[in-house]
Amino acid sequence: MEHTFQYAWVIPFVPLPVTMSIGLGLLLVPTATKNLRRMWAFPSVLLLSITMVFSSNLSIQQINGSFIYQYLWSWTINNDFSLEFGYLIDPLTSIMSILITTVGIVVLIYSDNYMSHDQGYLRFLSYMSFSNTSMLGLVTSSNLIQIHIFWELVGMCSYLLIGFWSTRTVAANACQKAFVTNRIGDFGLLLGILGLYWITGSFEFRDLFEIFKNLIHSNGVHFVFATLCASLLFVGAVAKSAQFPLHVWLPDAMEVPTPISALIHAATMVAAGIFLVARLLPIFTVIPYIMNLIALIGVITVLLGATLALAQRDIKRSLAYSTMSQLGYTMLALGIGSYRAALFHLITHAYSKALLFLGSGSIIHSMEPIVGYSPDKSQNMVLMGGLRKYIPITKTTFLLGTFSLCGIPPLACFWSKDEILNDSWLYSPIFAIIAYSTAGLTAFYMFRMYLLTFEGHLHIHFQNYNSIKNGSLYSISIWGKEGPKPVKINFVLSTMNNNEKVSFFSKKTYQIDGNVRNLMRSFSIHFYNKETSVYPQESDNTMLFPLLVLVLFTLFVGSIGISGVTDMDFDILSKWLTPSINLLHKNLSYSPDWYEFFINAIFSVSISYFGILIAFLLYGSVYSSFQNLDLINLFVKTGSKKILLDRIKNVIYNWSYNRGYIDVFYATALTRGIRGLAQLTHFFDRRAIDGITNGVGVASFFVGEGIKYVGGGRISSYLFLYLFYIIIIIFLLIFWSLI
């Protein structure tokens, strides 16, 4: 067994030969490498599969024996300073390794078809393999120095992946935004690491945890400084895992190819921040203020991410905000000390979210031949609808992923989210109420996404649709429905009343004037004929196979953490994890009984079903029937109440669609402020600093010229100066005598 652990150091480096081979091939024999580009997918999947098998073997041994293995190499720089490099194999490492490799494999298989047409296919594979290497190196690190090295490599890979389509301006801006935002967290992490080393004199985890704990308990270090160092470490995790207030890069990162979105949101970049907090939790637990801060940031992110997802039209942005919210649950669990529940939800969410992202990729892939290859159209849920009869396999897998994220039993996320909700009651009823309420919001926006995409009719075939990007010719109601909107250009819509406002339940269709239609026809595509032969098609088998694999994970991975609800011992996760860090369940024999489990589950599931019901009433196939029968209007009479309700809906929509105005605040308070400061500094530098130096030079020039002119050897110049000084002296004498 120990023989197996001795070779665990190879785990991060197994996928690396693919990146190196592709790079050397493109450098030395570019033509042959590009001609055989599809061949590189096989070694990418093969090497990552070897890593997965090795990681699984280590995990099985840990489950059976609860072993923790660490190996260190000491590098002595001088007598007073030495660095230790090595690897650490503990339950957290094995969990993250399996998560990274399994999700990475299905994403690579999926990408072989999805990215086959892209000219950057080889670059895509090299980036993906190097990203897996960086993430595996991060989770196997045994000290803070290695953590920081691989942390920066993960950030670099994320920058390269987000900017994969760098020729598109929005993608280039997105990768820069992600890079700058994460540099804030990286700087905080570096300062925190240096501060901890100054306190403890060690970078290695075990020594650092023990020394730090003893210093805190014995008052051997200033408590404020120790809290500051721990806070700086947490800032790095906040930025990397897109937690409030450094979450603004996440929705813009959806400019990447969809397989990259699945990898980033499930197993790599956003999971790195959660891993860091879990790894350093022994430091955070001895400082209660930090634990409270972690829980507070988590619960704010939970609610913020859910509210921002309510009115999104882009299917990938909706999933991005969902990731932000679900990682908030994980951060909340870590903040309240529920270590097991946090890692459990990290596992279940990773597979469910990978399924949803790859499912959205299949949807986008089916829509692109119809609406074009612009993300503004192919990812717009308003142009979808009715896809269930065209892509039934994708529909089924996406529905299962949706139910899982909504917390519907017996799917994966139900078990982990329910455990977090229960533990939150023990920590803070206020946090618990927010977490439970957000569970209902999650069910609402996830089922809204499903209904807009798969139910009803294919919206793109509606009469009067055109593919113009400008929203002035068509508009979307606040909840994603198509509706009228006043046109502010010099077109005349014959039946539109510009004073009429968009109604929440309105389905009225306005006819476009013939002149306008003729003008539009010259630069847009029309789908007036509902019987057109162009319809979405189901994806190829190489894209459907990963979806089916992830469905199996979504169905059964939750069973590894079922605790106390059956007579059989299925709780593999508790055997896997070292439970001593869990502050809430210190009694290892504690587990909820059947009655307690069902009471808690019924409450949380009822909230989820309520959110699904609201979404179904607003977007389901019976929506038009409810409207025609005025069942909804029975509850909302015309008058002040309806006006108030419309205002509330508009406030919610504006908050969600404008990203909570946080980006606007950053653009106003930070971006413009920094630019103004830069302009002021530039002005001061040009006018003051350069003015002084240039003034000295100019003055020296004129003085020199004057001296040169006076001392040129001319008698006339000497006489002139002599008379000039005589006149000055006489003038001064006269002036002095008068005084």
Swiss-Prot record:
Its EC number is 7.1.1.-. The chain crosses the membrane at residues 9-29, 40-60, 89-109, 144-164, 184-204, 219-239, 258-278, 280-300, 327-347, 354-374, 396-416, 425-445, 542-562, 597-617, 719-739. Pfam families: Proton_antipo_C, Proton_antipo_M, Proton_antipo_N. It is found in: Plastid, Chloroplast thylakoid membrane. Signal peptide: none annotated. GO terms for molecular function: NADH dehydrogenase (ubiquinone) activity; quinone binding. Keywords: Chloroplast, Membrane, NAD, NADP, Plastid, Plastoquinone, Quinone, Thylakoid, Translocase, Transmembrane, Transmembrane helix, Transport. One of its GO terms (cellular component) is chloroplast thylakoid membrane. It catalyses: a plastoquinone + NADH + (n+1) H(+)(in) = a plastoquinol + NAD(+) + n H(+)(out); a plastoquinone + NADPH + (n+1) H(+)(in) = a plastoquinol + NADP(+) + n H(+)(out). It is a multi-pass membrane protein. One of its GO terms (biological process) is electron transport coupled proton transport. Belongs to the complex I subunit 5 family. NDH shuttles electrons from NAD(P)H:plastoquinone, via FMN and iron-sulfur (Fe-S) centers, to quinones in the photosynthetic chain and possibly in a chloroplast respiratory chain. The immediate electron acceptor for the enzyme in this species is believed to be plastoquinone. Couples the redox reaction to proton translocation, and thus conserves the redox energy in a proton gradient. NDH is composed of at least 16 different subunits, 5 of which are encoded in the nucleus. This is NAD(P)H-quinone oxidoreductase subunit 5, chloroplastic. The gene is ndhF.
